[in-house]
Amino acid sequence: MVEIVEEPDDHQSSSTGAGSSGSSSAPPPPPPPAYSSISQYVSANTMECVLFAARVLTVFFALNYMIPFIGLVPAHSAYYKIFAASAATFALRLHTRIQGQFALNAQFIQRLIIEDSFHYLVYSVVFLMAAPVSMAALPVTIYAALHACTFMTKILRETGHTSSIIPKLEQFTAHQTQNALGIIACSEIFLVPLLVSLIFSGKGSLLLPFAYYRFLSLRYASRRNPSTRQAFAQMRGSLQNVAMSSSCPRPISSLIYRAIDFISARAPPVM
């Protein structure tokens, strides 16, 4: 899922050779835009534009949920629309990743499981059918915002626009992507105790933590996005430092080590 990089431009400027003065001081002319207008880009890249629209809707509904006084969509309705738009986004993204090749065999299922888009499609469907948990909206909203910013810079550059906002957006995504991925990974981990608490409060199904555990296992094993593994490693290091501290009571230290061993024993291999 972590493809927050701009694709290189395949178009190269051609040299004419006629009237060349041989002067090294003149800068080369900028390459012509790949598309003459935004409408032309949309016609040539329809799926990318549909994904962009779905991501913008995800962010829009998230803002309506997190800032209720906007008032365009009721907060309760906006919450579930976040995950509906997110599920549509990841379903379309998964379709493009597997290139529409569907088969009922073990090889196809294995290919499906390793796709990050499949992980977040499962995530979106799980929370679409569960009681509202505000933190659950954070990962899909951040992903939608990052990908939307990346798409905006791409379409503006490829249609010849020279707005000053383009380098600012590129700089923002380049500098904040790793921080955003870390926030996403931590929020996904911290959701576990919240989902367990839903069961004791009578708002959650017994199947919810098990379904979410499967999602978290897939994220941990992801070969394209190591953020979840890194977050677990950082938390493990922090807890070990606490357990080794002389001020930590021995029963607490023992409990921490047992918890670390319990979780580490269930860590899946990288796919």
UniProtKB/Swiss-Prot annotation:
GO cellular component, one term: membrane
Localization terms from the record: Membrane
Protein's UniProt name: Transmembrane protein 33 homolog
Chain spans, region Disordered: 1-32
Primary location: membrane
Transmembrane segments: 56-76, 125-145, 180-200
Keywords: Membrane, Transmembrane, Transmembrane helix
Top-rank taxon, per record: Eukaryota
Lineage of origin: Eukaryota, Metazoa, Ecdysozoa, Nematoda, Chromadorea
One example of a Gene Ontology biological process annotation: membrane organization
Topological category with respect to the lipid bilayer: Multi-pass membrane protein
Composition bias type Low complexity, residue spans: 13-25
Family: Belongs to the PER33/POM33 family.
